[in-house]
Amino acid sequence: VKLSKRWSTSLLAHYENETKAHDSNDDGFADIPRVEQYNLWNRWAYMGDRYVFQAGIKVLTEDRNSGQVSHGKTSLADPYKISIGTDRYEAFTKNAYIFNKEKNTNLALILSGSLHKQDALYGRKIYDVDQHNAYASLLFETELTKRQSLSAGLSFNYDSYDQHYRLDNDAAQPLTKKFTKEAVPGAYVQYTYNWDDKLVLMGGIRGDHSSEYGYFVTPRFHVKYNPNEYVHFRLSAGKGYRTNHVLAENNYLLASS
C-alpha cells in the first residue's frame, strides 16, 4: 500500500488448518501431518532521493502432529505420536545512503534478529530448542570506472542454542541439557570488472574470527563469459565454512528407529 510519495507498507497474513488425520493405506499411521499454522508479515519502506529504508517483522506459530491413528471406536493404549510446536519471530531493517548516484557510491547498514522456539516429541524421544540469532552488516560500494567496481564491508553474527533432549525411548532417562553460542565478526573486500556484460571477473576475500574456532580466511573468484545471448560460461572457485548444529538441523531423524 502506497501511503505517500515516499512511504509504503504491506501486510500479509496466512492461516492453515489441516487437523483431520488421513490413513488411506490403513497402516495405522497418518499419511500426512495434521497442521495448524499462523503467519504474519509486515514491511515498511521509505524511498528518498538519497536515503532508502526498509523494516519488517515476521511471526510464525505452528503445531504439527502425526503418528499412529485409531480407526473406528478402537483406541490405542500407548500410541506412537509425533508432535512439533514451533514459534518463530523475526525482525529486520535495511538502511542505505547514496553519496553519488553517477558512480553508485553508497553505504548500507543491515540489521536482523530472530527468536526460534521448538518443542518436539517423537514417541518418547524429546528435542526442545531455543535459538537466538543477531546479525549486522555494514557495506560500502562504489564504481571506480565505467567497468570497475569495488565493495567492502564489516559483519557480525551471533548464534545461541539452548537444547534439551532425550535420544532414546526410555522415558525414565533425564533430559540432556546443552547450551552453545558463537560470535563471528568479519570483514571482506571484493573487486568486479565488467566488460559490457560479455565478460565479468569478480574476486574477493574475507576474514572472520569465530569465538569457537578462531580465525579463518575465505577467498573466492568468479568468471562469467557470454559470447552471445544463447551461450554462457561460468567458473567459480573458493571455499567457505559453516558451523554444524547436528541435532537442530536433523532432529526429524529421531522419528526413525
Language-model features: locations:
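Hydrophobic, lipid-facing positions within transmembrane beta-strands of outer-membrane proteins
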Residues: 1, 36-42, 87-93, 132-138, ...
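Outer-membrane beta-barrel strand-turn architecture
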Residues: 2-7, 46-50, 97-103, 142-146, ...
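Surface-exposed extracellular loop regions of Gram-negative outer-membrane beta-barrel proteins
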Residues: 6-25, 37, 102-121, 149-159, 167, 211-217, 225, 229-257, ...
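Flexible loop and strand-edge segments within Gram-negative outer membrane beta-barrel domains
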Residues: 18-39, 47-107, 113-131
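Proline-centered turn/helix-capping motifs that create local helix->coil transitions or kinks
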Residues: 61-65, 158-162, 242-243
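Surface-exposed loop/turn segments flanking beta-strands in extracellular/periplasmic regions
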Residues: 68-80, 164-165, 169-175, 252-257
